Amino acid sequence: MAQILAPSIQCQTRITKTSPLATPISSKMWSSLVMKQNKKVARSAKFRVMAINSGTINRVEDLLNLDITPFTDSIIAEYIWIGGTGIDVRSKSRTISKPVEHPSELPKWNYDGSSTGQAPGEDSEVILYPQAIFKDPFRGGNNILVICDAYTPQGEPIPTNKRHKAAEIFSNPKVEAEIPWYGIEQEYTLLQTDVKWPLGWPVGGYPGPQGPYYCAAGADKSFGRDISDAHYKACLYAGINISGTNGEVMPGQWEYQVGPSVGIEAGDHIWASRYILERITEQAGVVLTLDPKPIEGDWNGAGCHTNYSTKSMREDGGFEVIKKAILNLSLRHKVHIEAYGEGNERRLTGKHETASINTFSWGVANRGCSIRVGRDTEKNGKGYLEDRRPASNMDPYVVTALLAESTLLWEPTLEAEALAAQKIALKV
């Protein structure tokens, strides 16, 4: 992100009642996605034309786009949680008797954890606690998406529930006083369904070298714009604090930015945005991957750069606070790397706008460093830092909480601090 501005004033865990005229993302948008993708989608389009002749698709689409708001007080709540891999999103729907404005108004629910790799078959019940709600861009009306975290029946967070610990860190008085802001740059790659090869690439072959694809326009340079744009609009509709999107360096790869968000909201909004993206690619007949290095060779990987600032960093003299934070991050480099995403060693090679995974570095305007500081921050003497190490498949609850913990709660010894400052050429 070019800069971190003030967070939106909208309450990120509340939702207002929508107008009865509110509608979900139109069927025309989904149709355009379906008609423009890979061979499988072409076959689907052929079936679609045949089905339209019999009226089947028209009747189904009428029901899919039906706004139930004028006809019932009940709403549909889509409960969303993180599955057993720590990166997959799962969901199921239930009827709620009336519109809600806050997750505390929603009931807890349960699911079969043995089917998601999160519980044994003989004791498979996992409990969902609603934590944040968003408007549903697929169903429209007063219907909602519900971000949940997962617990045992005894109330203990299950191992894949990283939100629980993050919430504890963000509720620490020292952290709350600093009002941590996050701007997260989520990169992702679109794959052709049948062959698991990037969208726009010749099957079994490669496009021309990187260079013409970043932020490009044109049928020979930009692949998947409809999906990116549909996702952008769906996130805005949902109330996600999405701030931008762009085509990436590798063809078939895209990025969107979420933030600035305060504390735990950053993780909630990233997970909600990922779920929406999964649903859109599902309807478009395209596969979404968050693999940090989907294609080996001279191609950029996919990251999740995390921009971070505290109240002290944003005030006059904040650059000195930023440098102290960088010092702490250098001393905990291995801790962060271990928590920054699976397969990240394939991406952090020191090439393709990355630093080496084994070496901590920082610099002003240097995209080959672990931590980048912008020119404006250096010039103004205050601002934010960008952690370029997180992989595209990182857990935002883990990354955001760890940044706060390392820079606001963890204190190194003076000796370790002095040695680290000398090692990374940092005057504090």
Swiss-Prot record:
Homooctamer. One of its GO terms (cellular component) is chloroplast. Residues 75-155 form the GS beta-grasp domain. Transmembrane segments: none annotated. It is found in: Plastid, Chloroplast. Belongs to the glutamine synthetase family. Residues 1-49 form a transit peptide. Pfam families: Gln-synt_C, Gln-synt_N. Gene3D superfamilies: Glutamine synthetase, N-terminal domain, Glutamine synthetase/guanido kinase, catalytic domain. The light-modulated chloroplast enzyme, encoded by a nuclear gene and expressed primarily in leaves, is responsible for the reassimilation of the ammonia generated by photorespiration. InterPro entries: Gln_synt_N, Gln_synt_N_sf, Gln_synth/guanido_kin_cat_dom, Gln_synth_cat_dom, Gln_synth_gly_rich_site, Gln_synth_N_conserv_site, Glutamine_Synthetase. This is Glutamine synthetase leaf isozyme, chloroplastic. SMART domains: Gln-synt_C (SM01230). It catalyses: L-glutamate + NH4(+) + ATP = L-glutamine + ADP + phosphate + H(+).
